[in-house]
Amino acid sequence: MKKILWTLGALLLLGVISIFVIEQWLAKNLEDRVNSNEERAYDLTFEEVNVQLFRRSIELKQISLSPRKTDLPSTIRGTMTSTRLGGVNILGILFGDVLEIQELKFEEPKFVFTKIDSVARKPTDISDAFQGLFGDIISRGVIHNVVLNNGSGEFFTKSDSLTKFGSFDNFNISAVDLETDSVRLNYAIPFKLKSISSSLKNLHLQLDEELSFSLGGFSFDSDADAFDLRDLKLAYEDSNLEAAIRSDVQKDFIEIDVKHLKIEQISARSSIYGNWSVVAGLITIDSLNLHDLRNKNKPRPVDEPEKPMFEGMVELIPFPLEVDTIRVLNSQITYAQISEGKTKPGSLNFENLSAEITHVVSLDSLQSGEMLIHGEAILNGFAPMRMDVTVPYTREEGKENFQLKASVDPFGLPSLNNILGDLVSVNITSGSMEKLEITMDANEYASSNFMKFDYQELKLELKDEQEEKKKFMSTLSNILISNNNLPENRNYKTATFQTERNIYRGTFNLIWESLREGMLEIAPGDLMQLIMGEQDPSDGGKRR
């Protein structure tokens, strides 16, 4: 009996010693094992290893990630409080060449992304770099699940010194059932997997000296096939008004604020990481506020390109996009300009905007059929309006066209004074608009239009004239125009006309010019068209 107890005691002691030796061996050799691949892009080092053999668990503390090549256009370095390897195949480490782990968990990693200052900043550069980092680490073994908790990062440019241009925090990833021998570049973890969820908060990027982009948060869940972005902002350091005043040239200064953007019914053909491509059933944009400002006191750029129309704008999207429906809710779009000789902008405000755009395809090789746009808004708070646009996909460069039908509900005509502003030489003192409808058949050079503009009791008053001359000319103007234009009137007028497109201005400028020309065609006589008309500058309309 005593001999048996001695034997059991010896075996137990031998087992304890063996476990201790194995744990010490693993602690000593693990760093060499995880850095054994000569083709690895990063070195993974750590100061402390805690091996728990019975739990099949290894915990690494004070981890550092550093690139093996430091002369690349962009690099990532990282530190972590701890990393846990759970469900480790101990026998595989001891007697095999493969490191098999059930779960790899990163706690509070901090990343530093650095790029050479001479290289242009592209958001895809950052996501590509992180995808490469995760792929490099996870490919060092057979890892079934990956968890990253509470990560953060900073972005720097490098010239003579480091300059910070961005940051993020609360970065989380959970990837389940990875197949590390099967590459798939759709997600942050670049392997085939059963499911992945990820989230991030407080992303900020300084795009240039004046313009910045921020994102309050995003989340992605592959099981729900949904991608959420909240509080997106594209803004100038002070405002787009101040930026337009400082600028040496005339151009569009655009600020964007979006409360919520959601992409749903995401196809497996999509890639939401690295080189973006989005194939989805529905994109919902809630509470978009877009403000576009132009300062006409500044000269246009000498080499200014021609502006595209609807099809061309879709093709300018910098990544492949194929979406069944884009839905816009609770939004506002403002087009503002500072007229020549003025210091304050006037604006067109499309409030309470809702829209639905179907069959949106950015790659011309995939385009077929037509894109349909339906929109409703209230113009400057007084004129409810609707618009339907059909955009055929021509797939031919320089052959854009669209057909538009729009209508505006009744409103008081004096409300137009705030919109017409400095574009005309008169004020509207009274009158009501009963119906305004326009159809347009537009190509890249001109639009053929038909318009109904029904109004009654229209009266005008000239601006900025001596009192006697002002009274006389205002009386003459009201004699020459038709005070009423209703279907029951004998001289009821509609307008069939053409509007030449200014190729250096956008599509909405063509729509506005067509509306303006149609109103002038119907309401005033020849004298008023001369008074109200705006002549093209000698440069073919570039300054308009």
Each predicted region: which residue ranges?
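N-terminal type II signal-anchor transmembrane helix
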Residues: 1-39
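Extended terminal
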Residues: 2-8, 390-394, 407, 418-544
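A short, amphipathic edge element
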Residues: 40-47, 431-433
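Flexible beta-edge/linker motif
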Residues: 45-118, 131-160, 164-167, 174-232, ...
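Glycine-rich, small/hydroxylated-residue low-complexity segments
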Residues: 99-101, 198, 215, 256, ...
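Structural signature of outer-membrane beta-barrel domains
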Residues: 109-111, 237, 456-458
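Short, flexible helix-coil linker/hinge segments at the edges of structured domains or between repeats
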Residues: 118-127, 243-245, 293-311, 344-349
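Interface amphipathic segments
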Residues: 164-167, 180-225, 229-245, 299-302, ...
